[in-house]
């Protein structure tokens, strides 16, 4: 930030000792430290405010783009033409809709029953299966 080299810093320290004196130097350095701290605090607050304004502008811009894109999509696909995926076809009667739902659920039930059959078969081998001499007896 400030381009102060070692020689400039040494000159400033010598002048400060001569002007302020060694007795008042700690008080002067404390005061200078407080000023520098306040300057940093104000600078940080200012930078944070600018970052927040930039972030808000970006969010507003993205919101505007999102609204435009949403309007385009809604114009291409009007709401009256769209149906929910899980809703039955309105042309079907209630009985036909129930039957279609039951047919869709059958493969899942069959898979569950098959897994249960396999588990019970693993636990209790059939009597016709030969036993090896090393297998444990029930």
Curated annotation (Swiss-Prot):
Compositionally biased region (Basic and acidic residues): 98-138
Molecular function GO terms recorded: protein transmembrane transporter activity
TM ranges: 1-21
Location(s), subcellular: Cell inner membrane
Subunit: The Tat system comprises two distinct complexes: a TatABC complex, containing multiple copies of TatA, TatB and TatC subunits, and a separate TatA complex, containing only TatA subunits. Substrates initially bind to the TatABC complex, which probably triggers association of the separate TatA complex to form the active translocon.
Xref: NCBIfam families: tatB (TIGR01410)
Function as written in the Swiss-Prot or TrEMBL entry: Part of the twin-arginine translocation (Tat) system that transports large folded proteins containing a characteristic twin-arginine motif in their signal peptide across membranes. Together with TatC, TatB is part of a receptor directly interacting with Tat signal peptides. TatB may form an oligomeric binding site that transiently accommodates folded Tat precursor proteins before their translocation.
Protein name per Swiss-Prot or TrEMBL: Sec-independent protein translocase protein TatB
Organism encoding this protein: Erythrobacter litoralis (strain HTCC2594)
Name of the coding gene: tatB
């Amino acid at each position: 930030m400030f381009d102060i080299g070692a020689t400039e810093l040494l000159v400033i320290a010598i002048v400060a000792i001569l002007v302020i004196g060694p007795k008042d130097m700690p008080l002067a350095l404390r005061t200078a430290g407080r000023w520098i701290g306040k300057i940093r605090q104000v600078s940080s607050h200012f930078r944070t405010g600018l970052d927040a304004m930039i972030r808000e502008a970006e969010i507003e811009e993205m919101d505007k783009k999102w609204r435009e894109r949403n309007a385009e999509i809604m114009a291409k696909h009007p709401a009256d033409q769209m149906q929910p995926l899980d809703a039955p076809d309105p042309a079907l009667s209630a009985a036909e809709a129930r039957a279609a739902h039951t047919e869709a659920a059958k493969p899942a039930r069959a898979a569950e029953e098959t897994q249960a059959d396999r588990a019970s078969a693993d636990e209790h081998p059939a009597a016709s299966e030969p036993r090896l001499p090393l297998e444990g007896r029930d």
